[in-house]
Design a protein with these regions (language model features):
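Short, Gly/Pro- and small/polar-rich lid/capping loops
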Residues: 1-22
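A generic structural signal for short, solvent-exposed coil/turn residues
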Residues: 3, 17, 29-31, 117
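Short beta-strand elements
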Residues: 23-31, 35-41
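N-terminal glycine-rich phosphate/pyrophosphate-binding loops that anchor nucleotide-derived ligands
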Residues: 24-26, 125-131
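Metal- or metallocofactor-binding catalytic centers and their adjacent structured scaffolds
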Residues: 43-123, 127
Length: 131
């Protein structure tokens, strides 16, 4: 098995199919793989759900997520660059230890890393998840 490492993490605000703003994260690897994932808030927010970072400005009734996307573009990108894309647990643990990072950005990046890891190993996503 060859190793593939994270080259770049980027994120942007997108308008989702549920008619709310979400974060689309893209993970690029050294071997040229690109994987994307979108995270948006649920219809109802339960007590065990992560709290999302919203812009709280006039645009999108305060529900924009450009600040959250920026935390992925800066903090998360800097920390994950060079990590083995197939080491999902290590990557998630690293992101969970970060301070001042939006949970919605972490969720989107984690899902994009998961997809990139499966592509890197050339296995179906379900197989990568299940080991």
């Amino acid at each position: 098995m060859t190793h593939d490492y994270i080259k770049r993490v980027s994120a942007r605000q997108v308008y989702t199919i549920r008619h709310i703003m979400g974060i689309e994260a893209t993970v690029e690897t050294e071997c040229g793989i690109k994987a994307k994932a979108v995270c948006n808030a649920g219809i109802s927010v339960g007590s065990h759900e992560v709290s999302f970072l919203y812009d709280n400005d006039e645009k999108w009734n305060g529900r924009g997520v450009t600040k959250a996307a920026e935390s992925a573009n800066t903090i998360i990108n800097d920390v994950l660059r060079g990590m083995d894309v197939t080491r999902q647990s290590d990557i998630d643990y690293t992101m969970l230890k970060l301070k001042n990072v939006a949970s919605n950005a972490v969720a989107a990046v984690s899902a994009a890393v998961l997809k990139a890891g499966a592509l890197s190993l050339d296995v179906p996503l379900y197989q990568h998840i299940g080991g």
